[in-house]
A protein has these predicted regions:
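Bacterial N-terminal signal peptides
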Residues: 11-21
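Basic, amphipathic alpha-helical recognition segments used for DNA target recognition
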Residues: 131
């Protein structure tokens, strides 16, 4: 009888030890995420993820979370596909430019709608999370994603070969490289011809006259050497270029609670630094572009810009609302109300 009791005690102890080992093994198992980016590794944001954020994540999770970062060209997807890719769970994280997702989910591009949301440094940041939380909440739910961090690539301007925009006829006969329908409409408003060129071919297109100019930001033009062939910067402040990192909700929900809490605390602590980092880099790249490329800056006249904004509702914003379909007008009105509440003007609405 005593031997039987001893055996039961030993069996119980072994069972508890085995169960503890299984639980411990589960808690400590490595989780592997894949992150696709629209960048090629040269942008400020790409460098921060590779050199700072991913190592930090591995450190604060004690090596339990590993992230495999793939740049454009290392994964098979175009920039425009990344929202769909993260929504489906093909990637756990994506880093891209909202403006490139206009054909997939135009409502998200409200934050980069030309001549609508302010693009002077710091302006969009004032209203951005109100827009996400108050206006776009249902859009994120539809795509099964949420925002982790966002940086801003800086205000978008016209960069031109050997001319300036003086009036509504200055772009007649000129071809301007764009990357979404909203910018197409802006170029058409100025009587120019929008052309689409793959990102890898932009320099050649500018060099050979396939395009006479393009719309981009300072750092992108600087890093890709576009200013060698389009050295005239028409400071237009068309819109900002919002570059968020979205995560698949299932991937996030699959993390242990302690890991979720640690990561959320980390991302919250990095929000301001990450948000303004690229904007500050733009300033450094602008200064460097003067001696490096002999970049010339010509601010668009206030009167011309004001007239463009006044015509933007019919020429740019209304067509965007129509492309959005159901819910587009509600998103536009919701953001317009936030802008007016924050002291910004929304002409024509």
């Amino acid at each position: 009888m005593r031997n039987l009791w001893s055996r039961k005690v030993i069996l119980l102890i072994v069972s508890v030890m085995f169960f503890s080992m299984v639980v411990s093994s589960y808690a400590e198992k490595e989780i592997h995420w894949t992150m696709f980016t629209a960048g090629t590794g040269v942008s400020w944001a790409d460098k921060q993820w590779k050199n700072i954020i991913i190592p930090d994540i591995e450190r604060i999770t004690n090596g339990r979370l590993k992230i495999d970062l793939l740049y454009r060209g290392e994964h098979p997807y175009k920039d425009a596909d990344l929202l769909r890719v993260v929504s489906e769970g093909t990637a756990d994280l994506v880093s891209g430019w909202v403006a490139n997702w206009s054909g997939t989910e135009p409502r998200l591009t409200i934050v980069d709608l030309p001549m609508f949301v302010p693009s002077y440094p710091g302006d969009l940041q004032r209203v951005y999370h109100r827009i996400l939380d108050e206006v776009l909440k249902d859009v994120f739910a539809k795509w099964n994603v949420h925002e982790l961090l966002t940086t801003w690539m800086g205000a978008q301007h016209f960069y031109l070969s050997d001319f300036w925009i003086e009036d509504f006829n200055s772009l007649k006969g000129k071809k301007i490289r764009t990357f979404n329908p909203e910018l197409d409409d802006l170029v058409k408003l100025l009587n120019g011809t929008p052309v689409r060129v793959d990102a890898a071919e932009v320099y050649t297109a500018l060099q050979t006259g396939v395009a006479d100019g393009l719309i981009t930001g300072v750092s992108n033009g600087h890093d890709n050497m576009y200013f060698e062939v389009v050295p005239n910067m028409e400071a237009t402040f068309i819109c900002d270029c919002t570059a968020p990192v979205y995560i698949n909700n299932n991937s996030w929900d699959g993390l242990p609670e302690d890991m979720q809490n640690a990561l959320q605390k980390y991302f919250d602590s990095k929000r301001e630094w990450y948000g303004m980092g690229q904007t500050l880099q733009n300033g450094l790249d602008l200064i460097d572009s003067f001696p490096k490329f002999n970049l010339k800056v010509h601010p668009m006249s206030k009167d011309l810009r004001k007239e463009i904004v006044e015509k933007s509702y019919e020429a740019i914003w209304k067509p965007w609302i129509e492309r959005c379909g159901e819910g587009g007008e509600d998103v536009f009105k919701g953001v317009a109300d936030i802008l007016k509440n924050e002291g910004f003007e929304v002409p024509g609405f």
